[in-house]
């Protein structure tokens, strides 16, 4: 199992180029199952979850190849089951279900795996598809969906805001008869990107980015070329790298207007932030950040995927900051690892109270999930001595070449293969 060895402390400064957003690329790749003609998807990050998705699509009969862009041809799909072997590593595979039942009248997906951060039930996906007329059975660890003829448009009020279920319902509804309205829909930029992709193929979706999405069903979707939006979480992670180390970081090929809540908190922490159309810069002028308090919330609130990075920021900041996690359970698993490096914090249910310390010391630590692992690597960059971060397969699921980008900012980091 690979590890990172990080020598600190380092002031992280320089430029990084932001990759395409994993959280948009994944639903877009699955939504390509709806297309009867070839699609080209640009700016897809090179990540483990993307590779797994392409393997899964290939098993369903999609012609999938990568040559700069990702090229998918789902015109000859002849298998409608996403098997356990591939699904077990990645929760996103549930997104195959809606397109399969919408286009082919049947689909089955093994109950999924992925990061171990609390309950992420597939119930909302299932009830949404049932409201569109699908019959759902849970058998032998598989979710099986079927419909006679086509799905039927419906007025769906979601019990709670869910990015995953919004994607499932929106994708499936593109080929339903009649009009579907999703109330209490998720508003994330990645939802907007998925809708824009589907519209490029001939779907009729309006309102994405608001809490009410309307989908007028069409007979078929064709092909097209689409570019995935930049990764706002990767952008935020590298900005935090600059903030905790007193550095100056410029993120190129970014989309700052998807990051309002994060940029506001970085300014509150004392950072000087500048933005352009496709870049954002942070300058700490050598200062320590000030602690900030925040609550995670669905977009446009503060993203849960930036919570671990801001926990780290608070733990090395001046003062005390309180972070409340409202989206997922078990999302403070990085905190005991940071405590091994000298961080002071208390966890009270869904709240983390961070008491900033002037410096961290190196330690051997273990990644527990994707964003937690990023915070541990950044902690190693600013800690005194050599930090070893174990189980970095988590980080490879969501960050493209993170060590190369950190090296470009001046980090002293190397990947050690499990054998060494």
From Swiss-Prot:
Keywords attached to this entry: Cell cycle, Cell division, Cell shape, Cell wall biogenesis/degradation, Cytoplasm, Peptidoglycan synthesis, Pyruvate, Transferase
Pfam families registered for this protein in UniProt: EPSP_synthase (PF00275)
Keyword NAD tagged: no
Pathway(s) the chain acts in: Cell wall biogenesis; peptidoglycan biosynthesis
Catalytic activity: phosphoenolpyruvate + UDP-N-acetyl-alpha-D-glucosamine = UDP-N-acetyl-3-O-(1-carboxyvinyl)-alpha-D-glucosamine + phosphate
GO terms for MF: UDP-N-acetylglucosamine 1-carboxyvinyltransferase activity
2-(S-cysteinyl)pyruvic acid O-phosphothioketal modifications at: 115
Subcellular location: Cytoplasm
EC number annotated for this UniProt entry: 2.5.1.7
EC class name: transferase
Binding site for UDP-N-acetyl-alpha-D-glucosamine: 91, 120-124, 160-163, 305, 327
Keyword Cell wall biogenesis/degradation among record annotations: yes
Binding site for phosphoenolpyruvate: 22-23
PANTHER family linked: UDP-N-ACETYLGLUCOSAMINE 1-CARBOXYVINYLTRANSFERASE
Known function: Cell wall formation. Adds enolpyruvyl to UDP-N-acetylglucosamine.
Protein's UniProt name: UDP-N-acetylglucosamine 1-carboxyvinyltransferase
Organism: Erwinia tasmaniensis (strain DSM 17950 / CFBP 7177 / CIP 109463 / NCPPB 4357 / Et1/99)
Organism taxonomic ancestry: Bacteria, Pseudomonadati, Pseudomonadota, Gammaproteobacteria, Enterobacterales
């Amino acid at each position: 199992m690979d590890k990172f060895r990080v020598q600190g402390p380092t002031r992280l400064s320089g430029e990084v180029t932001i990759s395409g957003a994993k959280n948009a690329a994944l639903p877009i790749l699955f939504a390509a199952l709806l297309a009867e003609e070839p699609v080209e998807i640009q700016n897809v990050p090179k990540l483990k979850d993307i590779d797994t998705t392409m393997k899964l699509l290939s098993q369903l009969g999609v012609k999938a190849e990568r040559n700069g862009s990702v090229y998918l041809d789902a015109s000859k799909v002849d298998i409608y089951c996403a098997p356990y072997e591939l699904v077990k590593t990645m929760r996103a595979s549930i997104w195959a279900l809606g397109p399969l039942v919408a286009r082919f009248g049947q689909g089955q997906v093994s109950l999924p795996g992925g990061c171990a951060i609390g309950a992420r039930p597939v119930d909302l996906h299932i009830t949404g598809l049932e409201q569109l007329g699908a019959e759902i059975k849970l058998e032998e660890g598989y979710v099986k969906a079927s419909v006679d003829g086509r799905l039927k448009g419906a007025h769906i009020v979601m019990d709670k805001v869910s990015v995953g279920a919004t994607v499932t319902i929106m994708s499936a509804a593109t080929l339903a008869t009649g009009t579907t309205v999703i109330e209490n829909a998720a508003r994330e930029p990645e939802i907007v990107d998925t809708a824009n992709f589907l519209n490029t193929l001939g779907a009729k979706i309006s309102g994405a980015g608001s809490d009410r999405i309307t989908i007028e069903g069409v007979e078929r979707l064709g092909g097209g070329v689409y570019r995935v939006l930049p990764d706002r979480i990767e952008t935020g992670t590298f900005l935090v790298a600059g903030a905790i180390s007193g550095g100056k970081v410029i993120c190129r090929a970014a989309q700052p207007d998807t990051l309002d809540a994060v940029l506001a908190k970085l300014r509150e922490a004392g950072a000087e932030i500048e933005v352009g159309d496709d870049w954002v810069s942070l300058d700490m002028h050598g200062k320590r950040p000030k602690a900030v308090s925040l609550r995670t919330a669905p977009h446009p609130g503060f993203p849960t995927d930036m919570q671990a990075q801001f926990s780290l920021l608070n733990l090395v900041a001046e003062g005390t900051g309180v972070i409340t996690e409202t989206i997922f359970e078990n999302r403070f698993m990085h905190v005991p690892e940071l405590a091994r490096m000298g961080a002071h914090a208390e966890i009270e249910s869904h709240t983390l109270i961070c008491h900033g310390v002037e410096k961290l010391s190196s330690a051997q630590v273990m990644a527990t999930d994707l964003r937690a692992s990023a915070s541990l690597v950044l902690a190693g960059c600013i800690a005194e001595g050599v930090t070893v971060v174990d189980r970095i397969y988590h980080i490879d699921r969501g960050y493209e070449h993170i060590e190369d980008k950190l090296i470009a900012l001046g980090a002293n980091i190397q990947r050690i293969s499990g054998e060494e």
